[in-house]
Amino acid sequence: MQKYISEARLLLALAIPVILAQIAQTAMGFVDTVMAGGYSATDMAAVAIGTSIWLPAILFGHGLLLALTPVIAQLNGSGRRERIAHQVRQGFWLAGFVSVLIMLVLWNAGYIIRYMENIDPALADKAVGYLRALLWGAPGYLFFQVARNQCEGLAKTKPGMVMGFIGLLVNIPVNYIFIYGHFGMPELGGVGCGVATAAVYWVMFLAMVSYIKRARSMRDIRNEKGTAKPEPAVMKRLIQLGLPIALALFFEVTLFAVVALLVSPLGIVDVAGHQIALNFSSLMFVLPMSLAAAVTIRVGYRLGQGSTLDAQTAARTGLMVGVCMATLTAIFTVSLREQIALLYNDNPEVVTLAAHLMLLAAVYQISDSIQVIGSGILRGYKDTRSIFYITFTAYWVLGLPSGYILALTDLVVEPMGPAGFWIGFIIGLTSAAIMMMLRMRFLQRMPSAIILQRASR
């Protein structure tokens, strides 16, 4: 029992800074929305539309680079720290190539925006302008993620938290300057949010690099003789590990986007209630997501040390802590769902629907916690391909079709509206949780030599 308590302390010490970093990132998006809304409703809508395109694109790159964390954790655990610098350099090359692709997609996103039904031309122009300003921050964001993954792979999660809050503090005044046109800068409105956010990502990257160069704990790995050129074999391995994670993230983001589109014809009350419940549940999701990042680090480190039993302990402890957290957040959600809904909107119909949907959200919080931590465990074992298959099957084969049938058809019951989609979420996330656990058990029952061989690839 003592080993599980000790492991839980280590996991929480790693996870809490990740939680705070995620809060800072969420707060940046909130600040952008509020400050653009203070300029005009059109600018706020433009930022919202631009963000809905930016997020899937940048999260794809983010997911691809998450492969670095278990690779570095495993090298650190095995004492092969001299190989870490080379992996990081290849990570920067990969980030550079991916950022060019993302920038090309975002530059041409105007075709998607203007194709939207009944969109106001002025709104479309502002959304395109916002994206074309923001896209210059894509390399900065992805380079920052490489540096952050280096630190987190070495079990240093506090730097990411500090840089997140530095970014938030810089974002507010820079937003103000470019939205309203102060200190000789042009008045750009919502487009100014894109300029500010792009600048902030570069500031965060440069601050993180400055920290890494000065950190005594990384003195032995931060330098490499000469300039490392792209190495196809290393980059191919990073892509093999990262692409399934990137696609899984993409499937998750697009699932919720598709559901939002399917709910939109049902009316203002249904859309508002759905959005409130979704926004609150996404805030709760920060907890298991951060714990999953910590579990990846611990499992990768233990496998690097050659201890499959300690890796199992880290995995089981992560799941136990995650279930405890999810139980507490579910009780909190059920107990205060009406009061939470009132913070967003005071329309009685909207509050009633949002409170009902939050009840369904509370039901899936434990499943959601298990599946996201399960994903973190599999990343630690470098078994990322299974994450892709499980996510696709659970979300797009089971969750979305069942939600659509329950919400919009009478094949099973009378059309349930948004609640049907939320039952679909429960089905999808519970299926994902079950499949993640089955895959984890399958991996852990392999002979230790095979597990360690797979982890050292």
UniProtKB/Swiss-Prot annotation:
GO molecular function list: antiporter activity; xenobiotic transmembrane transporter activity
Annotated keywords: Antiport, Cell inner membrane, Cell membrane, Ion transport, Membrane, Sodium, Sodium transport, Transmembrane, Transmembrane helix, Transport
Residue spans, topological domain Cytoplasmic: 1-10, 74-92, 148-159, 210-242, 297-313, 371-386, 439-457
Topology in membrane: Multi-pass membrane protein
Residues that span the membrane, as ranges: 11-31, 53-73, 93-113, 127-147, 160-180, 189-209, 243-263, 276-296, 314-334, 350-370, 387-407, 418-438
Subcellular locations according to the entry: Cell inner membrane
GO CC, alphabetical: plasma membrane
GO BP terms: sodium ion transport; xenobiotic transmembrane transport
Pfam families, per the entry: MatE
Topological domains annotated Extracellular: 32-52, 114-126, 181-188, 264-275, 335-349, 408-417
Function: Multidrug efflux pump that functions probably as a Na(+)/drug antiporter.
Similarity field: Belongs to the multi antimicrobial extrusion (MATE) (TC 2.A.66.1) family. MdtK subfamily.
Name recorded for this polypeptide: Multidrug resistance protein MdtK
Gene from which this protein is expressed: mdtK
